[in-house]
Structure formats: structure tokens, C-alpha cells
Amino acid sequence: DVGLRNAQLNFRQQEENHIMENIIYNELLIRGFNVDVGAVEHSERNENGKVVRRRLEVDFVCNRGNQRYYIQSAFAIPDSSKMQQEQKSLVHIGDSFKKIIVVRDRIKLWRNEEGIVVMGIMDFLLNPNSLEL
């Protein structure tokens, strides 16, 4: 709960990105999902040309019955490099379940070239069917 977190920290840290993640997490629980943090193994070449394995985090892996969604929480995506960073873990998931990035800004829901849905937090919260869009 965001209020309990803030009280525990004596209202010293107002990290909006963590608060947004907490809000998304609580909403997913309210909607009846089992929610976990996910990780994806990915190999890439470093600046020396050596192949290195990286572990990429998925903020939320949401399961309810036979439904599964992968969700990234991104406070802001000001440019294409930030978009690549946020979607990197999602594009390396080897299944066809829906992948979603939720951002703080009010934006029109859209689907990028990787098939990832990008939506604003208000659309996510106010529409109980937002994950189906």
C-alpha cells in the first residue's frame, strides 16, 4: 500500500516511479491476478565483441487462469532509447502472450512494431478491460 510505504519512510521519499509500480501492482491484485516479477535471459555482444549473458527484468508477470500478461511500468518514455530500454525484456520473451508498457502520461493507446501495447496509467486503471485492448 502506498500510504503505508510513505508512513514507514516518514514521507521523506516521494519516488513517483515506485509509487506508480505499487499502484499497478495493487490494481492487478484487485483484478484477481497472481503477480510475480519475471526475468528473461538474453545474450548479446559487449563493446569488446564478447558474448555476455544478461538477465532482464519484467516488472509484472500476471496470471489468472489461462491468461498471462507481461507488463512493464515506465514513468516516462521521452525518446526512442528509453522505449528500447523498456521493451527490451518484453521482446526477448519466447511466447505469444500479450506484452504491455504502462506509462504515467495520458497517451492514446497504441501498439508498436514489436506488437507491444503502450497505454497510459489512467486508461489502465479506469478501464477494467484495459488489458484486453
Predicted regions and their residues:
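A cross-kingdom feature that marks ATP-driven nucleic-acid transaction machinery
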Residues: 1-133
